[in-house]
Design a protein with these regions (language model features):
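Acidic catalytic motifs of isoprenoid enzymes
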Residues: 1-157, 161-195
Length: 195
């Protein structure tokens, strides 16, 4: 049976190769924590693909929130990624509220609602991608304050927007458009033009 560290590493290798290869450059003792963080991110980011409608997805995100907040101990202990991320949070004194905001932001993924403004998109990418970079920096600092919060914020938005643009055909095929309505309007385009 595969241990939680190997399980998380396999998820990241299979589902997030960019972060997998980047993690190989990290010090060996930090890699299990990073793989747990990125496996958790993969788990919540792919929920839409594993459900047929939004409500079951919201239930899964609620389960993750409860696990992160210290509830569902037995269930979390039996789930390799949940067990690993709870351990990493504890070992590195990671802020649980950042993880909770990540799960709350991922509710947007479950619906095809338009994103009204650039500010709304920045909020979503900040709570998902920027938070992930910031948490990784804390892990790399051994649980200490690494500095660079503002840089992590900007880097996360840039990384996420690049990913969203790269995935535009995939998202459009399922009825989602992450380009804010105000940006489309400035260009004389409408959301339906991309679907």
């Amino acid at each position: 049976m595969m241990d939680t560290a190997a399980f998380c590493e396999k998820i990241v290798r299979d589902e997030d190769p960019d972060r997998y290869f980047a993690t190989l450059f990290a010090p060996a003792e930090q890699r299990p924590g990073l793989f747990a963080l990125y496996a958790f991110n993969s788990e919540i980011a792919r929920i839409r693909e594993s459900v047929s409608e939004p409500i079951p997805g919201e239930i899964r995100l609620t389960w993750w929130r409860e696990v992160l907040q210290g509830e569902r101990y037995e269930e979390a202990s039996a789930h390799p990624v949940a067990a690993a991320i709870r351990s990493v949070i504890s070992d590195n004194r990671l802020p649980v509220d950042a993880f909770v905001r990540m799960t709350e932001a991922r509710v947007l993924d479950l619906y095809n609602d338009p994103i009204p403004t650039l500010n709304d998109l920045e909020g979503y990418t900040g709570d998902t991608s920027s938070a992930l970079i910031r948490l990784a920096a804390i892990i790399l600092a051994g649980g200490g304050e690494p500095g660079g919060a503002e840089a992590a914020g900007h880097a996360g938005v840039a990384y996420a927007v690049t990913g969203l643009l790269r995935a535009l055909p995939f998202h459009a095929q399922r009825g989602q458009v992450f380009i804010p309505a105000e940006v489309l309007a400035r260009q004389g385009a409408r959301r339906d033009d991309l679907l």
